Swiss-Prot record:
HAMAP family, alphabetized: EF_G_EF_2_B (MF_00054_B)
Name used for this protein in its record: Elongation factor G
Any single GO BP term: ribosome disassembly
Gene for this chain: fusA
InterPro entries, per database record: EFG_II, EFG_III, EFG_III/V, EFG_IV, EFG_V, EFG_V-like, EFTu-like_2, G_TR_CS
Cellular compartments annotated: Cytoplasm
Organism: Acinetobacter baumannii (strain SDF)
């Protein structure tokens, strides 16, 4: 089967924005105008086509990037048919993993901003992610019909907050309830959309008299931006004082692809105005798969040679699995972006990350939650495969004879964890299966079993992230679960060397028990030693027989697991068995194991024991206005500020080390201090001694019989 649309007429774009900028509504309109959905889905009714998980429709936020294919030939059918693959991305800070994941497979992006709220914190995070993957982008200012809408203020905010270089190619006619359409600066005509056909039809008209000067000023700005694309265009502009429509589009396109400028449009998706012109801009200014840098990877040879794959059907097959979803009807759906070659239904592919060969069952083209079976996918396509068992997010799929591993995505480690248990014992196995599947879909979510308590611990990127996981377990797998409070994993250690006797003697009728040891406990530098515990013996003259050394070691290690001070695992100790005695008849392994355990317990309390707490490396990015409040708050949380950097757009990056115990609820506090404009990331740095006043509270609770981990 030959290719239906030439690859030069493909556009793989992401639509991303801050929560409530109207991104899902914008995507809905795209599907409506391109003829994919016949009834417009409104988020207000919880019926949006792209938001297809139940939680999304309930909460009115987008969690998973659904990928959709649609076709567009221009507002006035002025283009041949183009194929647009749209990936809708979430706008909540706990889901940046989804944004990062979709940015990785896009060729271009459309940033949606609210005409009232402007550039908000998540917009800044998404902008940085788009910079990281060098994604060319355009901006759409939505909600022009809302009270307080101001297009030109958003243009300024893009410059100051994002360090962007926006070039408007339309200006709004009116604003708030008088918003009626836009002036197209390339055509220098007003565009008025027909309300009866929900904006399907439009007509060009004269520019309103009161807007002529504004339009002329912004047109000059746009033409100058286009002229800077090349010396040739600049010479033409200087000679003629203007550029033709074709030259303007060519100049703006070249600079957009080089990420030097961002073409900017506006409208109201809800009122069916402006999205149509934005679709034209996607075709005019965003790249096809052949216009972005060829994907790079590593070959399967001794030297791990770097190689690239051109976006062509003739090249060997290579694709990246960027999302895995569990579907009630077909099981695992693996979303892939094909970079090169062709894949047919039933073909075998090789996964170099897992060193496994797998066969593709069906290939489906997704339209939000509707699916259409197709026979093959080619370079530039985005589709979902059914039947892949061992693929996880970020894996490469390629031709078995031409193995290449495309660059892997990096996923942050989880920062919050809590215990979860099924409400009924019968659900235990169902819960394990559910958590396993969810962890496969989402690499930023982890599951493990706590060795001490036997509890199942789930870890993720934030409180909302884990809420939604628990919610999905209930809905998709029918498992009701109880969740514990967020926990900190403390550790215990010693600061000085001590020698301690340990004796275990039992004399009842018949055979007795006898174990007697002297153990020296020394502080061990975990980093230098490369281990958390070491056992040695310096026994002279056989006072403790060799066969009992292992038992003493075992007794000490078992005691270390559950701590002495506050019930947390002990680390950083070297135990040396140096003396003792035994009894020919009564000594056995158990006696020496108990003697070792007692020696450790008593010696530990004399060796200046301390509690260690996890310290996190925290980085807060905040506009300068809120810096004082944020620094003050970090100090109150026992944080140590390590340094500061200046970022574009007057943003400051504050780097600090803060105990994890002080970071619960931080996201909410930080958002309220900065009116939602600061963002933060945190990762584990090291363990450090807990200050005495904090440690005393934790120890007292443990000694009073309170459970460890309930450190509120």
């Amino acid at each position: 089967m030959a290719r239906q649309t030439p690859i030069t007429r493909y556009r793989n774009i992401g639509i991303s924005a801050h929560i409530d900028a109207g991104k899902t509504t914008t995507t809905e309109r795209i599907l409506f105008y391109t003829g994919v959905s016949h009834k417009i889905g409104e988020v207000h009714d919880g019926a949006a086509t792209m938001d297809w998980m139940e939680q999304e429709q309930e909460r009115g936020i987008t969690i998973t990037s659904a990928a959709t294919t649609c076709f567009w030939s221009g507002m006035g059918n002025q283009f041949p048919q183009y194929r647009i693959n749209v990936i809708d991305t979430p706008g909540h800070v706990d889901f940046t993993i989804e944004v990062e994941r979709s940015m990785r497979v896009l060729d271009g992006a459309c940033m949606v901003y609210c005409a009232v709220g402007g550039v908000q914190p998540q917009s800044e995070t998404v902008w940085r992610q788009a910079n990281k993957y060098k994604v060319p982008r355009l901006a759409f200012v939505n909600k022009m019909d809302r009270t307080g809408a101001n297009f030109f203020r958003v243009v300024e905010q893009m410059k100051t907050r994002l360090g962007a270089n926006p070039v408007p190619i339309v200006v709004p006619i009116g604003a708030e309830d008088t918003f009626t359409g836009v002036v197209d600066l390339i055509e220098m005509k007003a565009i008025i959309w027909d309300e009866a056909s929900q904006g399907m039809k439009f007509e060009y008209g004269e520019i309103p008299a009161d807007l002529v000067d504004t339009a002329q000023e912004w047109r000059t700005n746009m033409v100058e931006a286009a002229a800077e694309a090349s010396e040739e265009l600049m010479d033409k502009y200087l000679e003629e004082g203007d550029l033709s429509k074709e030259d303007i589009i060519a100049g703006l396109r070249a600079r957009t692809l080089a990420s030097e400028i961002q073409v900017m449009l506006c409208g109201s998706a809800f009122k069916n105005k402006g999205v149509q012109r934005m679709l034209d801009a996607v075709i005019e200014f965003l790249p096809s798969p052949t216009e972005v840098k060829a994907i790079e990877g590593i070959l399967d040879d001794k030297d791990e040679t770097k190689a690239s794959r051109e976006a062509s059907d003739e090249a060997p097959f290579s694709a990246l699995a960027f999302k895995i979803m569990n579907d009630k009807f077909v099981g695992n759906l693996t979303f892939v972006r094909v970079y090169s070659g062709v894949l047919k239904q039933g073909d075998a592919v090789y996964n170099p990350v897992k060193s496994k060969r797998e066969r593709i069952g069906r290939i489906v083209q997704m339209h939000a939650n509707e699916r259409q079976d197709i026979d093959e996918i080619r370079a530039g396509d985005i589709a979902a495969c059914v039947g892949l068992k061992d693929v996880t997010t970020g894996d490469t799929l390629c031709d078995e004879k031409n193995i290449i591993t495309l660059e892997r995505m990096e996923f942050p480690d989880p920062v919050i964890q809590l215990a979860v248990e099924p409400k009924t014992k019968a659900d235990q196995e169902k819960m394990s299966i559910a958590l396993g599947r969810l962890a496969k879909e989402d690499p930023s979510f982890r599951v493990h079993t706590d060795e001490e308590s036997g509890q199942t611990i789930i870890a993720g990127m934030g409180e909302l992230h884990l809420d939604i996981i628990v919610d999905r377990m209930k809905r998709e797998f029918g498992v009701e679960a109880n969740i514990g409070k967020p926990m900190v994993a403390y550790r215990e250690t010693i600061k000085k060397t001590v020698e301690q006797e340990g004796k275990f003697v039992r004399q009842t009728g018949g055979k007795g028990k006898f174990g007697h040891v002297y153990v020296r406990l020394e502080p061990l530098d975990v980093e230098a030693a490369g281990k958390e515990y070491e056992f040695a013996e310096e026994v002279v003259g056989g006072v403790v027989p060799k066969e009992f050394f292992g038992a003493v070691d075992k007794g000490i290690q078992e005691r270390m697991k559950n701590g002495v001070l506050a019930g947390y695992p002990v680390v950083g100790v070297k135990a040396v068995l140096f003396d003792g005695s035994y009894h020919d008849v009564d000594s056995d392994e158990l006696s020496f194991k108990m003697a070792g355990s007692y020696a450790f317990r008593d010696g530990f309390m004399k060796a200046d024991p301390v509690l260690l707490e996890p310290i996190m490396k925290v980085e807060v990015e905040t506009p300068e206005d809120y810096m004082g409040d944020i620094m003050g708050d970090l100090n109150r949380r026992r944080g140590m500020v390590q340094g500061m950097d200046d970022l574009p757009g007057g943003t400051k990056a504050i780097k600090a080390e803060v105990p994890l115990a002080e970071m619960f609820g931080y996201a909410t506090q930080m958002r309220s201090m900065s009116q939602g404009r600061a963002t933060y990331s945190m990762e584990f740095a090291k363990y450090a001694e807990t200050p005495r006043n904090v440690a005393e509270g934790i120890i007292a609770k443990f000694q009073a019989g309170g459970k460890k981990g309930d450190d509120e």
